[in-house]
A protein has these predicted regions:
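Structural and coupling elements of P-loop NTPases
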Residues: 1-537
């Protein structure tokens, strides 16, 4: 399929489709209600009939986006998926992010593929550690952030105290789009500031259906809600006075964050979030390549792999590479080029994947996510293009903090063991470190959080029939180093240098004191902190 014939009609068609896209992810601390919000958004867009809850309540459907066996067992979303739906003539792509603290590496990759983030805050807890870690990543990527204060139907913090915390800890100015009427735990509804009306909150069947919302004028609200209404108006007024009225440019520039109040479990406040995404979130725009040159959206097809997932369909043992379309039109069946290898890749099996739901996708536009099946040659960070070579920036690796040696339980299955470890490394499930001293039989697995090891063990046993033993190492921090650190630290207690497959040498240390001791004794050694903003070369 040639896309080099760019007629004015074709250019305007691509621009129109890119302009209709809103691609975002939800960032939050575990248990802030992220999967519930995902369900509520899908419900509002009429994608699913009734929302399922992650907590596995009887007679409620399972949450659609949680699909791996471990996720089902634990009620958390470990693997990311993408949900696409239409709302008000806008195509919304919601990229699901793992809901567990340990999976920040996978979450980070998802944040490389979105244009905006929704920061979901538990009203009772405020900004928690994982939320702040993810916020920092969004800040580095210059992603605009919409803030949703969730669970307002339960007792929690004071609304103004939450605004102060957001300002102090993120540096963003809160710009209310809606404001809660009634204190947390006594949720009466919201003042919709854009339309100057009161949306009254009504409890429904535990969120399984869309909440019925009734709207009232400010005068009617003042009469029915009394001091709850006047307090809400006063509070929102204080926030606007000390910050600013809604300003799209300040939001896009990462200086301010729109604020909405909700109860996602009861489907209240969700429509207002959808409206905010449509009206204010940035559409798919030209994406810069490695040299910083933005590739126009009307250029021939290009995209990059932000996630690789295997074992999504047990019957087929398949591999799905998730691609963010950056330019042009993706058409199923087109043969594209992989920038890293220069090899051709046929896109015959292209799907939209959300949870266990899959459907064949024939075309996709900038901002969309395509799942390419049988994509075992593709790796996280790979760029693909139809015409006009392009390479997008590499997706950085997080600094690992947990290290374990892996060995095959059955020596006769070493081949399967090696293949499994290689495959999981390609998928980005785990970082793999090696050295001549340890040998090929005992690679060191490095993870951001300990649950990644459970995923590796589970996948090795079930997907590769290569059960393995893990042995914990005492290291807790890593630094980027060079080859000459290997002999220098060979006999040092509390330190070790290993080679990662991308060619980086990592020096591992028991603790910060071991690191300081070595920095003092070997001032000539390169020991650089691993920053999420330093792409792995």
């Amino acid at each position: 399929v040639s896309q080099d014939v760019l007629t004015p009609a074709r250019i305007s068609g691509i621009h129109k489709e890119a302009g209709r896209r809103r691609t975002f992810a939800v960032i939050s601390h575990p248990d802030a209600g992220k999967s519930t919000l995902t369900e509520a958004l899908a419900l509002h867009a009429k994608v699913i009939g009734t929302a399922g809850a992650s907590s596995g309540k009887a007679n409620r459907k399972e949450t659609v986006s949680d699909w791996m066996q471990m996720e089902k067992d634990r009620g958390i979303s470990i693997s990311s998926a993408a949900l696409q739906f239409s709302y008000r003539d806008t195509v919304i792509n919601l990229l699901d992010t793992p809901g567990h603290a340990d999976f920040s590496e996978d979450t980070y990759r998802v944040l490389a593929a979105v244009d905006c983030a929704v920061m979901l805050v538990d009203a009772a807890k405020g900004l928690e550690t994982q939320t702040m870690k993810l916020f920092e990543v969004c800040k580095q990527r210059n992603l605009p952030i919409i803030t949703v204060i969730n669970k307002w139907d339960r007792p929690g913090l004071d609304a103004l105290a939450l605004m102060d915390e957001i300002t102090e800890r993120t540096g963003l100015q809160p710009m209310p789009l809606t404001w809660a009427v009634g204190i947390s735990g006594d949720f009466r509804g919201v003042w919709d500031l854009r339309n100057d009306r009161f949306a009254r909150f009504q409890r429904n069947n535990a969120g399984a259906q869309i909440a019925l919302t009734e709207y009232f004028t400010p005068e009617e609200a003042a009469e029915s809600q009394g001091s709850n209404w006047t307090d809400a108006v006063d509070e929102a007024g204080l926030v606007i006075e000390s910050n600013l009225e809604f300003d799209v440019e300040a939001f896009h520039a990462g200086k301010a964050t729109p604020i909405l109040f909700s109860s996602a479990a009861l489907n209240f406040g969700v429509k207002e979030l959808l409206d905010a995404l449509v009206d204010f979130a940035p559409p798919a725009a030209p994406r810069p390549d490695v040299d910083g040159n933005p590739r126009p959206v009307e250029s021939p097809f290009s995209g990059f792999v932000f996630k690789v997932q295997a074992g999504m369909n047990k019957a087929h043992r398949d591999h799905v590479a998730f691609i963010r379309v950056c330019s042009g039109v993706f058409e199923r069946g087109m043969v594209v080029t992989q920038t890293r290898t220069g090899k051709s890749f046929a896109t015959k099996y292209a799907q939209q994947v959300f949870g266990r739901e899959r459907e064949v996708i024939d075309e996709a536009y900038p901002g969309d996510v395509v799942g390419l099946v049988n994509a075992s040659s593709l790796r996280v960070g790979d760029s693909l293009f139809l015409e006009g070579p392009v390479e997008y920036p590499a997706i950085p690796l997080f600094a690992p903090e947990h290290f374990q040696v892996a060995r095959s339980k059955d020596p006769s299955k070493f081949k399967q063991f090696r293949r499994g470890i290689e495959q999981l490394e390609h998928e980005g499930v785990i970082q793999v470190l090696r050295s001549d001293v340890r040998g090929d039989q005992a690679p060191v697995l490095a993870a951001v959080g300990p649950m990644q090891f459970e995923v590796v063990e589970d996948r090795m046993a079930h997907d590769f029939s290569a059960p393995m033993r893990l042995e914990r190492l005492p290291y807790s921090l890593a630094r980027i180093s060079t080859a000459d650190a290997m002999p220098a630290l060979a006999n040092v207690i509390g330190a070790e240098v290993l080679l990662r497959s991308d060619g980086e040498y990592l020096a591992l240390f028991n603790d910060v004191w071991a690191l300081r001791r070595i920095e003092k004794n070997h001032p000539d050694l390169t020991l650089v902190p691993i920053g999420t903003h330093n792409p792995a070369k």
